[in-house]
């Protein structure tokens, strides 16, 4: 069982693989992300197949405000950068900076979710665009909502880790968990780039 890391010597260059347990968790998580990729690919395929089924209701071109979606995209991409900076800080034994960058990541993620909730509310109230309005609506809310649920889970995960660090410090046992959480967060960001392109840009372009 790994104890607290001697910060005078620093963490190993790859703390996520410094122990056998860490290696197994890291490898297992890559398999998990593979399954997540298949899940999202299925939802993307369903959306592409149903996006024309508007049932005379609103289309993407009617709904989407690219300025709002662009702000959401920048928030999420910036949060990916701050999570990277947090990991760099941890490797340099600057755990205070790591905490700051991770909390900034959380704030940016929460802001993204806030805008997404506002977006959904706007569509429902102003356009009567509910989940059951059309096949397109169901596919839209399923795909974008699935991603939003992943963002919420990722934020919860990071917050739990930050609280655990505050109480117990970084160890060779929990350091890999920060790396895995960061990897998960980057995956969420990549998925959003595809959503931004396929759902919003292609939707506005017809």
Curated annotation (Swiss-Prot):
Q: Which SUPFAM superfamilies match?
A: Cytochrome c oxidase subunit III-like
E.C. number: 7.1.1.9
Tell me where the transmembrane regions lie.
Answer: 26-46, 68-88, 97-117, 143-163, 185-205
Q: Entry's InterPro entries?
A: Cyt_c/ubiquinol_Oxase_su3, Cyt_c_oxidase-like_su3, Cyt_c_oxidase_su3-like_sf, Cyt_c_oxidase_su3_a-hlx, Ubiquinol_oxase_su3_dom
One MF term in GO for this entry? cytochrome-c oxidase activity
Which keywords, in A-to-Z order, does the entry hold? Cell membrane, Membrane, Translocase, Transmembrane, Transmembrane helix
An example of a Gene Ontology cellular component annotation for this protein is: plasma membrane
Q: How does it sit in the membrane?
A: Multi-pass membrane protein
Similarity remark = Belongs to the cytochrome c oxidase subunit 3 family.
Q: What is this protein called?
A: Cytochrome c oxidase subunit 3
């Amino acid at each position: 069982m790994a104890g607290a890391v001697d910060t005078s010597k620093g963490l190993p260059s790859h703390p996520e693989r410094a122990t056998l347990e860490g290696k197994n968790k890291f490898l297992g998580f890559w398999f998990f992300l593979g399954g997540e990729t298949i899940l999202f690919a299925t939802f993307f395929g369903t959306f592409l197949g149903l996006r024309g089924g508007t049932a005379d209701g609103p289309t993407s071109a009617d709904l989407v405000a690219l300025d709002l979606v662009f702000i959401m995209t920048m928030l999420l991409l910036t949060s990916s950068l701050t999570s990277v900076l947090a990991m760099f800080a941890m490797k340099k034994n600057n755990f205070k900076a790591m905490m700051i960058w991770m909390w900034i990541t959380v704030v940016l993620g929460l802001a993204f979710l806030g805008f997404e909730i506002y977006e959904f509310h706007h569509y429902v109230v102003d356009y009567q665009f509910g989940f059951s309005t059309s096949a397109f609506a169901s596919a839209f809310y399923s795909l974008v909502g699935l991603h939003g649920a992943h963002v919420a889970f990722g934020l919860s995960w990071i917050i739990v880790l930050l609280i655990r660090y505050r109480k117990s410090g970084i160890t060779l046992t929990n350091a890999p968990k920060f790396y895995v959480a960061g990897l998960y967060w980057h995956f969420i960001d990549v998925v959003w780039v595809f959503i931004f392109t396929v759902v919003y840009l292609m939707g506005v372009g017809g």
